[in-house]
């Protein structure tokens, strides 16, 4: 019987990382079924897209306050959808403000909860580790020291490598001189500006 996975990802970066995770699961479990909140990359892998992250990404205090009713409606809808689908495993990808609430609900239903890409508790809100300990069965962490951090707090954790390494490994490297030529750049140094994970 195929295993049912419900995945919640609320940002563009989570869509990328969630899609790579889905591909990895399918390599081990070709019959795995997916139902998810994510984006186009996850949809390409296959399964049922319930909500697109573009409907979920609210940034900044004011935007969150102005959209609080929508956020609460989304949390309620997500809980109802999980209850109907009854997955074998719930995988939460980053997005802690939303996902920790979903973890608590899923745990109350006896669903296995896996959290992929840890909230940066070691940098802020270390107290949240108690919430994770209570409602998350397993952490899949992307920074080597996070595994020790969680184990110190008696949380099952596995270092799985950084997903951006997967993303860049799919790119074909280009020679710097060729890049400058293609983009009409002179020989001066290039400074890269790398925006965050949310599309605006």
Predicted regions and their residues:
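Active-site and donor-binding regions of nucleotide-sugar-utilizing enzymes
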Residues: 3-185, 193-200
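Internal, well-ordered alpha/beta segment that forms a basic, Gly-enriched binding/recognition surface
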Residues: 189
């Amino acid at each position: 019987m195929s295993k049912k996975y419900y995945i919640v990802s609320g940002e563009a970066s989570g869509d990328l990382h969630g899609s790579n995770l889905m591909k990895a699961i399918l390599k081990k479990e070709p019959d795995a079924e997916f139902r998810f909140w994510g984006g186009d990359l996850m949809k390409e892998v296959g399964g049922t897209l319930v909500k697109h992250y573009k409907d979920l990404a609210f940034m900044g205090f004011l935007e969150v306050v102005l959209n609080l009713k929508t956020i609460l409606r989304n949390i309620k809808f997500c809980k109802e959808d999980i209850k109907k689908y009854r997955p074998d495993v719930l995988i939460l990808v980053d997005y802690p403000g939303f996902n920790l609430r979903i973890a608590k609900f899923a745990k109350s239903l006896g669903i296995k909860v896996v959290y992929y890409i840890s909230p940066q508790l070691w940098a802020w809100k270390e107290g949240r580790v108690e919430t994770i300990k209570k409602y998350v069965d397993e952490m899949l962490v992307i920074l080597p020291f996070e595994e020790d951090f969680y184990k110190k707090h008696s949380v099952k954790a596995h270092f799985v490598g950084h997903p951006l390494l997967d993303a860049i490994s799919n790119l074909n490297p280009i020679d710097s001189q060729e890049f400058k030529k293609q983009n009409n750049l002179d020989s001066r140094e290039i400074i890269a500006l790398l925006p965050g994970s949310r599309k605006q």
